[in-house]
UniProtKB/Swiss-Prot annotation:
Entry's Gene Ontology molecular function annotations: ATP binding; serine-tRNA ligase activity
Species, as recorded: Pseudomonas savastanoi pv. phaseolicola (strain 1448A / Race 6) (Pseudomonas syringae pv. phaseolicola (strain 1448A / Race 6))
Keywords from the named record: Aminoacyl-tRNA synthetase, ATP-binding, Cytoplasm, Ligase, Nucleotide-binding, Protein biosynthesis
Name of the gene encoding the protein in the UniProt record: serS
Top-rank EC class of the record's enzyme: ligase
Family that this chain belongs to: Belongs to the class-II aminoacyl-tRNA synthetase family. Type-1 seryl-tRNA synthetase subfamily.
Pfam families registered for this protein in UniProt: Seryl_tRNA_N (PF02403), tRNA-synt_2b (PF00587)
Main location: cytoplasm
Protein name: Serine--tRNA ligase
Domains as described in the record: Consists of two distinct domains, a catalytic core and a N-terminal extension that is involved in tRNA binding.
Amino acid sequence: MLDSKLLRTQLQDVADRLASRGFTLDVARIESLEAQRKVVQTRTEQLQAERNARSKSIGQAKQRGEDIAPLMADVERMGNELSEGKVELDGIQAELDALVLSIPNLPHESVPVGADEEGNVEVRRWGTPTAFDFEVKDHVALGEKFGWLDFETAAKLSGARFALLRGPIARLHRALAQFMINLHINEHGYEETYTPYLVQAPALQGTGQLPKFEEDLFKITREGEADLYLIPTAEVSLTNIVSGEILDAKQLPLKFVAHTPCFRSEAGASGRDTRGMIRQHQFDKVEMVQIVAPEDSMAALESLTGNAERVLQLLELPYRTLALCTGDMGFSAVKTYDLEVWIPSQDKYREISSCSNCGDFQARRMQARWRNPETGKPELVHTLNGSGLAVGRTLVAVLENYQQADGSIRVPEVLKPYMGGLEVIG
């Protein structure tokens, strides 16, 4: 969340910057609540001081042999008024807190200004899409030909937007995840992490999914215990490792990577990508998270994005890198790069990774800090996250880009060790 001091001292400037994201900040409501808070707080503090003075005078009156009943009545009345004032103050603060939690992050000055995805800026391209000399098939046709990609059975088990993978395609899916994890551990310096797939609400609030995006989550309600949510991304569990912690400067940067299933209701995706594996309720992803000192976060974003790009390069999949504009960035990000991989059957690039610097936005929500050796004081860390990569979409890209005229699939060179040396499937 944003710094409350910034909202008090530079509210209009914050509103102007948020407008570039298409977000309208309710300045009047915040100003009104802040004014109410100040009035009630001042009144409460004055009442507390007066009550303390009256309480002290009771002892003095007692020593003089005076009737203390009126003073006792005053103290009791003031105590009741203080209790009422606290309830009122808590109510105002709760509304302010809810408003602040609904405000997205401020975009970095280097982010291109735009209203939607049309305003995104292509930064670079890598690779050249293959010019096939036959009619390309999509991944659904390729997978169903041999019975290795089974949406009908998945629908029988779980409904729409699920997939059942079998045989060589299931093995290829596993190979991709193992290859990605090994690359990030061995070449990029990440620590492999196994995390819970179910988290409590504070973890999701810490990374920004709650309270604003609850409809996108799968929730498990338990009688007598805290509700649990299936993770929409390992970003939630990985980033929250440092929730409530004060890290030593020597611990930074922290670099975590995890391969997990992800669960999303896709509440806003009705009618989009209904065929195949592009948009699923359950999908696997290899997620990278970095926890860094504030001055290092922009350089870390470039490095993290490069880590994700390296996966695509080694798989020899054509892709492009986009700098997202202000109107297309995620809620918690100050700056985001999207990687889009070439999908031959659609004749276009599709998102396969999103890499974001969240600045101190998530850290403030989580109270994740480090001790600055120059000041000796705890300060907020900066957090970054990125897909390295979405495994299902990478599988789609491999199936389509490595297809042959007879419907068989060549195995990418870097995956052959994970596939027992298999050269072709199908």
